């Protein structure tokens, strides 16, 4: 692995490092005594958590004039092709996908099924893969230019749009190559890459109650009635700001938004969807965030700890971890890290954690990026965050499988109700 040292023979590489957002900076070290010379930082590990690419809506709006979703929207761009196989977490057969079975029950006008990755989404994910290739293959020699399972671990939720999004990302990251990548996924009953209402009854009950209460909040209820009336949706129809945003976002990204009223209300719809989400998942309600994404944060935390542990066998770590997730995963994660920007996580957005080690002091640092922008996580002094401080931030919401089971126990529903 290349060590970044400030000597003449590495001048061009140092320049690339500069171009890659980790240039020399007048940044104070944690003790405040000296700046951190970023030329002495060696990249050790990267974790990328991303939302799938653009897709068809999950549930159409009950409007007389329905948007037409032509099957041509699902055509696969040749450059995004990449062979992959799907296994369970233990390497066995791919689990059944309950969600995909449900999506097949809804056909949108034009013939496209609900929740399907589109050509636009495939191109978005390919572009994200190309960005990762530039950052970690071309600008610095961190990853091999071809897929190597000893370097990259890939996990996705067991939904076709996420598996296909991962395929497109891999095509952008590793280009065309022979051989197949392995994507790991889990049973719906134990999945932790999204808030799991199937395995966590307490979260399900709390979310149901708070979602119902959110809709009746002053301002939200009036705006919902205004939007529904404006676009011609009966107040009796089961449509909230989440359903509205799902359709607006999908139609906008495919240039299919042909309802002037929906277009006029688009910004309000997104803001109110965010307001509802923040009401449902309160930042002050530590347990709600723990139940939503705590087990996933525990996995990310574990990857960091394994990498910095000198006793960890090389076969137990990877240079890069890729996780295909959802907007409902990213939003509580951003809240947990203190970097939520008050905007709904867009299609193909990524949250990237880079782990560095200083070659002289041997100190560890984390640099966090969301949607391509450097972030300062809660509890961190600056964008380059000492690992211990970053872990302290994660530990507030990270939960072990045992703690998760305790939090989600059905017996706690009665306790909380009392």
From Swiss-Prot:
Domain of life (superkingdom): Eukaryota
UniProt subcellular location: Mitochondrion
CDD domains the record matches: HP_HAP_like (cd07061)
Single GO BP term: hematopoietic progenitor cell differentiation
Positions of the catalytic residues: 52, 327
Kinase as UniProt keyword: no
PROSITE patterns: HIS_ACID_PHOSPHAT_1
Known catalytic reactions: a phosphate monoester + H2O = an alcohol + phosphate; 1-(9Z-octadecenoyl)-sn-glycero-3-phosphate + H2O = 1-(9Z-octadecenoyl)-sn-glycerol + phosphate
Keyword Mitochondrion: yes
Cellular component annotations (GO), alphabetically ordered: cytoplasm; mitochondrion
Keywords recorded for this protein, A-Z: Hydrolase, Lipid metabolism, Mitochondrion, Phospholipid metabolism, Transit peptide
Main location: mitochondrion
Enzyme nomenclature, EC number: 3.1.3.2
GO terms of molecular function: acid phosphatase activity; lysophosphatidic acid phosphatase activity
Annotated spans, Substrate binding: 51-161
Transit peptide: first to last position: 1-25
Role summary: Hydrolyzes lysophosphatidic acid (LPA) containing a medium length fatty acid chain to the corresponding monoacylglycerol. Has highest activity with lysophosphatidic acid containing myristate (C14:0), monounsaturated oleate (C18:1) or palmitate (C16:0), and lower activity with C18:0 and C6:0 lysophosphatidic acid.
Family: Belongs to the histidine acid phosphatase family.
PANTHER family: ACID PHOSPHATASE-RELATED (PTHR11567), LYSOPHOSPHATIDIC ACID PHOSPHATASE TYPE 6 (PTHR11567:SF202)
Complex formation: Monomer.
Protein name per UniProt: Lysophosphatidic acid phosphatase type 6
Origin species: Mus musculus
Taxonomic lineage from the root: Eukaryota, Metazoa, Chordata, Craniata, Vertebrata
């Amino acid at each position: 692995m290349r060590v970044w040292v400030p000597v003449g023979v590495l001048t061009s590489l140092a320049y690339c490092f500069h171009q890659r957002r980790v240039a020399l900076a007048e940044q104070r070290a944690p003790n405040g005594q000296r700046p951190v010379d970023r030329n002495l930082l060696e990249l050790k590990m990267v974790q990328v958590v991303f939302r799938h690419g653009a897709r068809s809506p999950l549930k159409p709006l009950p409007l007389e004039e329905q948007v037409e979703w032509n099957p041509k929207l699902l055509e696969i761009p040749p450059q995004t092709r990449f062979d992959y196989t799907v296994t369970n977490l233990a390497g066995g057969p791919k689990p059944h996908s309950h969600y995909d079975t449900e999506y097949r029950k809804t056909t949108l006008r034009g013939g496209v099924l609900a929740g399907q990755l589109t050509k636009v989404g495939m191109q978005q994910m390919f572009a994200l893969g190309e960005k990762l290739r530039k950052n970690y293959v071309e600008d610095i020699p961190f990853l091999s230019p071809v897929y190597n399972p000893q370097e990259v671990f890939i996990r996705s939720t067991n939904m076709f749009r996420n598996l296909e999004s991962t395929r497109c990302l891999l095509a952008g990251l590793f280009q065309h190559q022979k051989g197949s990548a392995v994507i790991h996924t889990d049973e719906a009953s134990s999945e932790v890459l999204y808030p799991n209402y199937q395995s966590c009854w307490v979260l399900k009950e709390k979310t149901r109650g708070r979602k119902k209460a959110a809709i009746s909040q002053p301002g939200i209820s009036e705006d919902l009635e205004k939007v529904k009336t404006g676009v011609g949706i009966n107040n009796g129809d089961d449509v909230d700001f989440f359903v509205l945003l799902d359709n607006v976002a999908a139609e906008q990204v495919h240039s299919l938004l042909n309802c002037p009223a929906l277009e006029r209300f688009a910004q309000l719809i997104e803001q109110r969807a965010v307001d509802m989400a923040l009401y449902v998942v309160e930042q002050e309600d530590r347990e709600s965030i723990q139940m939503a994404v705590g087990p996933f944060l525990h996995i990310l935390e574990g990857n960091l700890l394994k990498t910095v542990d000198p006793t960890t066998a090389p076969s137990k770590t990877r240079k890069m971890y890729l996780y295909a997730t959802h907007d409902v995963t990213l939003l509580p994660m951003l809240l947990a890290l203190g970097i939520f920007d008050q905007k709904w996580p867009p299609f193909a957005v990524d949250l990237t954690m880079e782990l560095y080690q200083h070659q002289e002091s041997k100190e560890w640092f984390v640099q966090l990026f969301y949607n391509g922008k450097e972030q300062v996580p809660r509890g961190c002094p600056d964008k380059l965050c000492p690992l211990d401080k970053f872990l302290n931030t994660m530990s507030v919401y990270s939960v072990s499988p045992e703690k998760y089971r305790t939090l989600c126990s059905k017996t706690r529903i009665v306790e909380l109700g009392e």
